[in-house]
């Protein structure tokens, strides 16, 4: 075999230039960058050195052959031409990985089989024995990449991906791969800071990946020094003496690095469940003297190195994937910025984020940004110098002390945001509305009400108070509105709400209200299962602000529910499309003789059952899971008081066809009126803004529109929120 080889090193997308620089420093020549990879030339010693020392590569591939191919036969022939007896024992084990397509190979599994067959046939014809396939831990792992008609056949020297250092056996919900963490540290300037004796702190350290990688860089520890099994361990071209030389050198450097006084490297994590796994990872890496992990909130983050030295604050905040996370993340970033300005003057900071727009809310200018990919997610690394001339004042933020409570998941900001002019106007409007509506709500003993409903066109939000929680719904912006401007106004509003209302940011829940199709409006959006009890008209109701688009309580129908309570005494009450049966609870409170509630959703009927039980009602209250139209066609009972509040549009696997309130309301009302007892009343309401009641109904029944009577002061600004009618038999 030649003394020089072509090597192909793979890496996460975005790390190519960093890997090229690192590989050159380790001896790779003629380096060229490709997408998610680099290639170059080196001897065997350098190949070993790259395996043990590369902090950034995924794999080190030794190229055996390049050949052109037009079809599957060319693939077989090209692989078969290699003298495989130089690489693999005839009775050994192998695994084959195939990537790319073209030249008649459109299935990677088929391509891998052709490569395997060529290797097996070559060895069997020569030795009379054949190797077997072992996917997990083979003697030799062969890789073939097909790129625009050229096949690149390689041996994988690394074995398992090099990002698997062996110390992180326990990880959190959103782990950062070790080589990506190392790349972020390098871009953030940690090698320079460490060489100067600086400190490092991570205020949201998870299980400590940044901390361990930082300590290995500072202590000159090869990232894969402890790896025992390599892709070259059973390769017949392996040179053990040369490998021992490279490994012994790395071992000596690690011992020398660990003999130095350790740098101050600390991590803080709010989730107590991650503390011990993080500490276990540190111990497995042999860095217990260098790295310490403590439980701590971002709101109390204050690094205090032993020698008062400055250093690097590095963090990978949560990205936010659940409904309502955006508000929490905004406050988290604001709080992180505040702690940096208050407790880390003179430090450098690096924030790795999948939501770079939130970095603008930290109150510090980012002097440099780098693009990365975390898997398929585009991310940015924001670099900061924590010094006064980089602080953003005026329209964004300015430090002002304010005592506030600490929070478990998204800490309360220790100082308020300096609001933009528009956000301050929004805050002023909230306070004005609170003053006016608050008096009414207290007088009426109402816990939950709408405080703001797109009063200012540029802030297209609905803001509802649920006791000391705020439920914010963002209306989808028209296509003519610049998405970046809409996002900026949303973030401004979210910054203003806690200040204007004097509440903890943790108690702000954000959702986006868009045009819903089918049953999407009823689908579960998260799984927190957090229910809270609220009061309305003497009844107790359960709401859930996080898990669904709606909360379980339609605030605009409050007057209708109160009307039902007043009129229900001694009546047989029927609630169709009952949702969580809040109107049924009011009817029971008002003394209804019996209640029947019908809905297709088991989830909401379970919720309804809990609402009834919460108020002590059970035996005389029937809950029916059924398609309302089908149920009405099969029911023959009579009712004195009926309430119908259907969705605008609905479909389900459990129902026949699709319900459309405009198209189907005549049939619905005719079926329901057939169940109305003489002298009874039916209330019909819906939220379809373009709805028109069929005029033929007015000829058949006594119909009175009562929409204006069903709006409380909190919805008086939006008299199109719903329409309602009172129907009786003629």
Curated annotation (Swiss-Prot):
Gene3D superfamilies: 3.30.2130.30, RNA methyltransferase domain (HRMD) like, Vaccinia Virus protein VP39. GO terms for cellular component: cytoplasm. The keyword Cytoplasm applies. It catalyses: guanosine(2445) in 23S rRNA + S-adenosyl-L-methionine = N(2)-methylguanosine(2445) in 23S rRNA + S-adenosyl-L-homocysteine + H(+); guanosine(2069) in 23S rRNA + S-adenosyl-L-methionine = N(2)-methylguanosine(2069) in 23S rRNA + S-adenosyl-L-homocysteine + H(+). Its main location: cytoplasm. It is an enzyme of class 2 (transferase). Keywords: Cytoplasm, Methyltransferase, RNA-binding, rRNA processing, S-adenosyl-L-methionine, Transferase. The gene is rlmL. It is found in: Cytoplasm. This is Ribosomal RNA large subunit methyltransferase K/L. Specifically methylates the guanine in position 2445 (m2G2445) and the guanine in position 2069 (m7G2069) of 23S rRNA. Belongs to the methyltransferase superfamily. RlmKL family. Its EC number is 2.1.1.173, 2.1.1.264. One of its GO terms (molecular function) is 23S rRNA (guanine(2445)-N(2))-methyltransferase activity. Pfam families: Methyltrans_SAM, RlmL_1st, THUMP, UPF0020. It comes from Pseudomonas putida (strain ATCC 700007 / DSM 6899 / JCM 31910 / BCRC 17059 / LMG 24140 / F1). The keyword Transferase applies. PROSITE patterns: THUMP. Residues 394-418 are annotated as: Disordered. CDD domains: AdoMet_MTases (cd02440), THUMP_AdoMetMT (cd11715). Residues 46-157 form the THUMP domain.
